[in-house]
Every structure is written in C-alpha cells, then in structure tokens.
C-alpha cells in the first residue's frame, strides 16, 4: 500500500483474531526487523489470555497496524519472546506489549487510535495505570500519550535504549 493510498482511507479498528497473526507478523517484521520478531505462539498466547485488549487496524481492506495488551501486576515487564503462562490474579496495570504500524501508514494516526482503544480498555478495567517497554525511537510518541520513564532493569532481549514506562490513570 502506498502512502497516498493509505492516507485515502481512515483506519478501522476491530478485535484481533488468531487468523490475523500472519499479517501481524508481517507488520512486525517491517516495523522492527528480525531483532524483535516474536513468534505466532507468543503473540497467540497473549491474544488467548486477553482478547479484549488486542486490536487490529485496517485501511482499504489491508492490515496497517495492531496492538497486543494484557493485564499485568507491579513486576516490571514480562520477558520478551516467551509466552505468558497466566495473567496475575491482581492486575494493577494494563501492559501494552506491542503496538506497531506498517511503514506505509505511519503518521496517519493509526498508533494513536490503537493506543486510545487499549487505554479505554485499561481505564475501564480499573487498572491504576498502564505500563510498556518503549524502544528508543518510540519514546517521544509514548511521552505524548502521557507515559514517563520508570527507572529499573528490563528482562533481556528488549535492546539498547529500551526503557520501562508508566502512565497513571487520569481523572
């Protein structure tokens, strides 16, 4: 999809389904390269545990972005490239595991729309805030969404410059 073509249609958000995983993996590879490519099994497990927090963005029938989120406790960040075994019994936060937009659709508001959907889910679930791990080049976007850096170590695999961020629920 060309930039002009992607700009012509406003993205439509819908719940993510298991049969969307091949398209999700293609966007993940285009967005991050091979270094952060997670398997369909890892992403499918997150989808199975928290389907209400996983969304897909489409434009003109093509997939242009996605977000995987899930309830999470106070313990930093979940490991990358490892399937979640279970969700915490008491979820203090909504955790944005991955939000990616196809390169052709960047700058069109897709990321903000996807984040808005999971923010509404997390706020509605009564979480006291949201957390995520931001890659260095995404930090400005997350700061604009109200996130601040939380000092501390991350599990291996998140890469140089990645940091844990948190956003408190707004009244």
What is each model feature region?
Residues 10-24:
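A short beta-loop-alpha structural element at the N-terminal edge
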Residues 11, 61-66, 94:
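Glycine-rich phosphate/pyrophosphate-binding loop shared by adenosine-nucleotide-utilizing enzymes
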Residues 15, 26-39:
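Helix-loop element at the rim of GNAT/NAT acetyltransferase active sites that forms part
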Residues 33-59, 68-86:
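Active-site rim helix/loop that mediates acceptor-substrate recognition in acyltransferases
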């Amino acid at each position: 999809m060309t930039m002009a073509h992607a700009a012509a249609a406003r993205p439509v958000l819908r719940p993510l389904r298991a049969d969307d995983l091949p398209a999700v993996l293609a966007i993940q590879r285009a967005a991050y390269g091979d270094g952060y490519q997670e398997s369909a099994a890892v992403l499918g497990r997150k989808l199975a545990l928290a389907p209400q927090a996983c969304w897909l963005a489409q434009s003109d029938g093509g997939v242009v972005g996605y977000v995987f989120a899930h309830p999470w406790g106070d313990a930093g960040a979940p490991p990358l490239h490892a399937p979640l075994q279970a969700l915490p019994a008491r979820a203090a936060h909504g955790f944005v595991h991955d939000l990616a937009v196809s390169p052709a659709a960047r700058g069109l508001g897709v990321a903000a729309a996807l984040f808005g959907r999971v923010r509404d889910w997390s706020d509605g679930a009564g979480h006291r805030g949201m957390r995520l791990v931001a890659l260095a080049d995404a930090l400005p976007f997350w700061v604009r969404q109200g996130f601040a850096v939380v000092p501390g170590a991350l599990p291996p695999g998140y890469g140089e410059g990645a940091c844990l961020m948190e956003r408190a629920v707004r009244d």
